[in-house]
Amino acid sequence: NITYIKQDEPRGIAHAIMLCKEFVNNEKFLVFLGDNIIQKSIKNFVENFKNSDYDATVLLCKVDNPSSFGIADIKDGKITKITEKPKEPISNLAVTGIYLLDPVIFEIIDNLKPSWRNELEITDALDNLLRKNNNISYEKITDYWKDTGTPQDILHANGEIISKHPDFVRRHGSNKVIIGKNCK
């Protein structure tokens, strides 16, 4: 069974998570944003979290443009700070939008103030959780990860995947598929 819980207006990822509070029923849970594309399974990350005492595990990935993402600062193997789209990034480790969370996050979200975007930011919730009890771990995605939040990102990801796995593409008809400027 699949259960959909609708967020009627964009009020932030933390707000969307809060809408799921009753559904989660006081169990650890996974948040996987729908615009993520990854190459490998996250099963091991999930199992590690389920068997841990952590309040959260955040999946991170190195990026070339850190000011476009939530960024985690790591010192001595621990997350020390999480910042949403920093103007001056403290690292190049992006928060991927894949979160393993304990229900303690709901108490943190309850006390969040809206950001400058008038949203309840998951990065603020995680940073507050970090300051409260410093019980957040992280895992790094070292293979393929792509945030496809824009149409250009979707096209770019399609091109990358097709070029690496041409055998996955089924061809129908006689025309070639072209991805590029001014295509129709």
Task: Report each predicted region and the residues it spans.
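Conserved beta-loop-beta/alpha segment of the NTase-like Rossmann-fold superfamily
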Residues: 2-76, 101, 110
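Left-handed beta-helix
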Residues: 103-104, 110-184
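Residues that form or immediately flank small-molecule/cofactor binding pockets and catalytic motifs
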Residues: 7-9, 61, 84-87, 143
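Short glycine-enriched loop/turn motifs at secondary-structure junctions
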Residues: 4, 90-93, 139-141
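Conserved beta-strand segments of alpha/beta enzyme cores
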Residues: 3, 78, 135-137
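A conserved mid-domain beta-alpha-beta active-site/ligand-binding segment of alpha/beta enzyme cores
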Residues: 92-100
